[in-house]
């Protein structure tokens, strides 16, 4: 049996562009893609912190070091420049490997530059 687990997350990045008439996808600064272990054309789930929208698209490379997060195509209707997004990717993990699985969790500053990398989500407490 396989389980679908969080593989990668880029937490609270700021939308820098919305390109309605681009053919689709989400362009992500190549530095962030590498840090999160997300490859070009990989399916990503995007959750808009500001308006609650959730959508699925695929990642493409944005200019390295630019901080670019460009929501493109019809998905551009689901975000505005300045909106905070969480970008996640998932993987199928064999049951035997679940306990050892560690996601890549990338945290950024307000210029979308990586400031922290973690490999677990802390337990939520009251």
From Swiss-Prot:
GO terms for molecular function: aspartate 1-decarboxylase activity. It catalyses: L-aspartate + H(+) = beta-alanine + CO2. Pfam families: Asp_decarbox (PF02261). Coiled coil: none annotated. GO terms for cellular component: cytosol. Pathway: Cofactor biosynthesis; (R)-pantothenate biosynthesis; beta-alanine from L-aspartate: step 1/1. Its cofactor is pyruvate. Its main location: cytoplasm. Keywords: Autocatalytic cleavage, Cytoplasm, Decarboxylase, Lyase, Pantothenate biosynthesis, Pyruvate, Schiff base, Zymogen. It comes from the Bacteria. Its EC number is 4.1.1.11. SUPFAM superfamilies: ADC-like. It is found in: Cytoplasm. Is synthesized initially as an inactive proenzyme, which is activated by self-cleavage at a specific serine bond to produce a beta-subunit with a hydroxyl group at its C-terminus and an alpha-subunit with a pyruvoyl group at its N-terminus. Gene3D superfamilies: 2.40.40.20. Binds 1 pyruvoyl group covalently per subunit. Substrate binds at residues 57, 73-75. The modification Pyruvic acid (Ser) is found at residue 25. One of its GO terms (biological process) is pantothenate biosynthetic process. The active site is at 25 (schiff-base intermediate with substrate), 58 (proton donor). Heterooctamer of four alpha and four beta subunits. Belongs to the PanD family. Catalyzes the pyruvoyl-dependent decarboxylation of aspartate to produce beta-alanine. This is Aspartate 1-decarboxylase. It comes from Acidovorax ebreus (strain TPSY). The gene is panD.
